[in-house]
Amino acid sequence: SNYSMKACEFAFNLAKTENAEVILLHVYFTPIYASSLPYGDVFNYQIGDEESVKTIIQKVHSDLNALSEKIKEKVASGEFPNVKYSCILREGIPEEEILRYAKEQRPMVIIMGTRGKNQKDIDLIGSVTAEVIDRSRTAVLAIPENTPFKQFSEAKRIAFITNFDQRDLIAFEAFFNTWKSFHFSVSLIHLTDSKDTWNEIKLAGIKEYFHKQYPGLEIHYDVVTVSYTHLRAHE
């Protein structure tokens, strides 16, 4: 898909910068795997049709081979950098297998493509991507299909949303350690439904803390007033 190729573009450019290897992980789901899950967790499949399973597996291999060929073409044309990469197939529930692989192999980052504006607004990043972001201990980059960027180095300004939680400081440290080889400024953003001077005081305090922790990092902050009624209407 187009959004998978956009994720590959980011991954290959990042691997070139970090002298790393790219692993293309694809997870597929078959009726046979579904039959091994607890009753009620799966749809009512008619198990026993081995031909349908064989067809699924053949299509998965065909799609992955097609993706690999596209990548080879882009490397040959110079559109993608020439870095080491390999393909891995796993059977199971996509989000579970992605998280399991990340726990086993501890990659630098997980890069996932997301659909463009032609998809439903309610599914902004996709349920699989959302689940991985929520549960992963590894940094996750969700790359929109239509983003004009080709690599992380093109992002010169980063918005960091904070709710003044202690976990935000831990999250920022993990973020900074992952991307510290790049040059960017950071805007600390707090969303609120009412004006409160304390919010700006708290943001200013976080800014000063970050200045001490990360000298040389350009940091700004802003309080954004939003209507939560409006936000809920779009959930």
Feature locations, PLM:
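Small/aliphatic-rich secondary-structure junction motif
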Residues: S1-E50, K156-D222
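Intrinsically disordered or low-complexity boundary/linker segments at protein termini
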Residues: S1-E9, N13, F80-N82, M108-T114, ...
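A short acidic, glycine-rich active-site loop
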Residues: Y45-S62
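A short helix-to-beta-strand connector/capping loop
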Residues: E73-S86, Y214-H220
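Charged docking surfaces used in two-component/phosphorelay signaling
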Residues: L89-E97, S227-Y228
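Glycine-rich phosphate-binding loop signature in dinucleotide/nucleotide-binding domains
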Residues: K103-P107
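Conserved small/polar residues in nucleotide/adenosyl-binding loops
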Residues: T229-E235
